[in-house]
Curated annotation (Swiss-Prot):
Keywords: ATP-binding, Cell inner membrane, Cell membrane, Membrane, Nucleotide-binding, Repeat, Translocase, Transport. The gene is lsrA. GO terms for cellular component: plasma membrane. Part of the ABC transporter complex LsrABCD involved in autoinducer 2 (AI-2) import. Responsible for energy coupling to the transport system. It catalyses: ATP + H2O + (2R,4S)-2-methyl-2,3,3,4-tetrahydroxytetrahydrofuran-[AI-2-binding protein]Side 1 = ADP + phosphate + (2R,4S)-2-methyl-2,3,3,4-tetrahydroxytetrahydrofuranSide 2 + [AI-2-binding protein]Side 1. ATP binds at G44, G45, N46, G47, A48, G49, K50, S51. This is Autoinducer 2 import ATP-binding protein LsrA.
Length: 527
């Protein structure tokens, strides 16, 4: 008889995993396999069950039924500590760091002494191309850098299974490239990677195998090369929505309330005029935004975009310069007064500064209106508002009083957008609006943002997704090391040019529009 070589068992095999919450089935007999040295991408709409499945594998949640095996050995009663010992590490979509501890302390937290090797940590950081200051507090980092710290925690634990939940959501293309390079090094060492993402080009670039989840089950699974982009999108789309056109824009235009569209329609004055503004992380910033205009703000992480946005909203003090909103100087105003004047900010970190996680959905969606109008409890009105946004953005939830923290990350982001829109913005500053949002929902959000602009609301659009910036913005300001490196519009506004300018190159390629600064030579002039 010919000698038969036994096939080694998969690194990870999940069979028949099911899970319910309060009688609602969220996972339906899931089978999932990960081989050594493989990237297995996991796709699915918000609420499809991806995060729940990964939390079960990582020992955070127990399954109701099913078996988890590593290298052919069953794993019973998994806890996060046991999962770490087995080499399973989940890098969450929302960084979960100790804000008051240093970066180094966060990376080494609870590591056994034999693994807490500072030389190894330095080498891993070098391999990733990271230039993090290990002595600063983790809470002072941008979200993208916090994400890299989370990944470092997994790498320091010699993880054999690395679960990455939307790891590139807040990373620039250069940072994404470095991360992928490090992942490929890990693959050569036999590490298996579960890669959760909504970015189909990244999945094609990195993943060997792809599984698509829909409504708690596996709708499609196989080699990535065997499926077209359309195959994946169709597999993600619920049957009830196939062939249906989004009505987000129509619903938004039907929303009641004074959107100030009439008062701005005939005005030629900018909604906001920022002159020579300086503050923590940026200097000598000047620009204006007209009613109905979407102004993109691009740059690499650390360029000062979020610091600028927070200063405009009054969360940080300005050291010099002026901010004029509808001909009123608001530079010294408190945040509450800026909100009352119509300046609304959708923050980058929804869990830390955007939503009240333990409060009901219906209360959250009207929270800024509460702050502005003192309407602390109008249940019927709140329910009606939430229902409109549920239909417009396809927000998935069970009941009105459900706490926000029970929603998936993408649905939390949609709720935050709804909350900001309901505050009746005159100027809306949007920081990473599609972070953690699936492919099918992005188009809804884009249409919604455009429909707001059509109602003469001025929009400052901040995103690390440069293709998204080009798609959405009428003009783009590119920041580099806290200053405006140039302004782009028209045909000059493309990903390649923005990328070069974001890394400090000076390109005079803007098409002037109504006094807009046209080159890097005009730093400090009105853009």
């Amino acid at each position: 008889m010919p000698h038969t070589v036994a096939t080694p068992p998969p690194l990870l095999q999940v069979r028949g995993i099911s899970k319910q919450f309060s009688g609602v089935v969220v996972l339906k007999s899931i089978d999932f396999t990960l081989q050594p040295g493989q990237v297995h991408a996991l796709l699915g709409g918000n609420g499809a069950g991806k995060s729940t499945l990964m939390k079960i594998i990582a020992g955070i949640l127990p399954p109701d039924t099913g078996v988890i095996e590593m290298n052919g050995q069953p794993c019973f009663n998994l806890t996060p500590a046991k999962a770490h010992q087995l080499g399973i590490y989940l890098v969450p979509q929302e960084p979960m760091l100790f804000a008051n501890l240093s970066v180094q302390e966060n990376i080494l937290f609870r590591l056994p002494k034999h693994q807490a090797d500072k030389k190894k940590m330095a080498q891993l950081l070098k391999n990733l191309g990271c230039h993090l200051d290990l002595s600063v507090s983790a809470g002072s980092l941008e979200v993208a850098d916090q994400q890299l710290v989370e990944i470092m925690r997994g790498l320091m634990r010699d993880s054999r299974i690395l679960i990455l939940d939307e790891p590139t959501a807040s990373l620039t293309p250069a940072e994404t490239h470095r991360l992928f390079s490090q992942i490929r090094i890990l693959l050569q060492q036999g590490v298996g990677v579960v890669f959760i993402s909504h970015k189909l080009p990244e999945i094609r670039q990195l993943a060997d195998w792809v599984s698509v989840m829909r409504d708690g089950g596996i709708a499609l699974s196989g080699a990535t090369a065997d499926f077209s982009t359309e195959d994946m999108i169709q597999a993600m789309t619920p049957e009830a929505q196939k062939g249906a056109l989004t009505d987000s824009q129509k619903l938004w235009l039907e929303l009641p309330g004074n959107r100030r569209a009439q008062s701005r329609a005939q005005s030629q004055q900018p909604v906001i005029h920022v002159h020579d503004l300086s503050g923590e992380g940026f200097a000598h910033i000047s620009f204006h935004v007209q009613a109905g205009e979407i102004l993109g703000l691009a740059g690499v992480v650390g360029a000062g975009r979020t610091e600028l946005a927070e200063t405009l909203y009054g969360l940080r003090p300005a050291s010099t310069g002026n901010v004029i909103l509808e001909e009123v100087n608001i530079t010294a105003m408190k945040t509450a007064n800026r909100l009352a004047a119509g300046l609304v900010y959708l923050p980058e970190d929804r869990q830390a500064s955007g939503l009240y996680l333990d409060a009901p959905l219906s209360w959250n969606v009207c929270a800024l209106a509460h702050d502005r109008q003192g309407l602390w409890t109008q249940p019927a009105q709140e329910a009606a508002v939430l229902e409109r946004y549920r239909r417009a953005l396809n927000i998935k939830f069970s009941h009105l009083e459900q706490p926000v923290r029970t929603l998936s990350g993408g649905n939390q982001q949609k709720l935050l957008i709804a909350k900001c829109l309901e505050a009746n913005p005159l100027l809306l500053i949007i920081d990473e609006p599609t972070r953690g949002v699936d492919v099918s929902a992005r188009s809804d959000i884009y249409q919604l943002i455009r429909s707001i602009a059509e109602q003469q609301v001025a929009i400052i659009f901040i995103s690390s997704d440069l293709e998204e910036v080009v798609q959405m913005a009428d003009r783009v300001l590119v920041m580099h090391q806290g200053e405006i490196n140039g302004a782009l519009s028209g045909a000059a506004m493309n990903v390649d040019t923005i990328m070069h300018m974001a890394f400090g190159e000076h390109r005079s390629v803007s098409e002037p529009q109504g006094g807009t600064a046209s080159s890097a030579e005009n730093k400090g002039a009105s853009c």
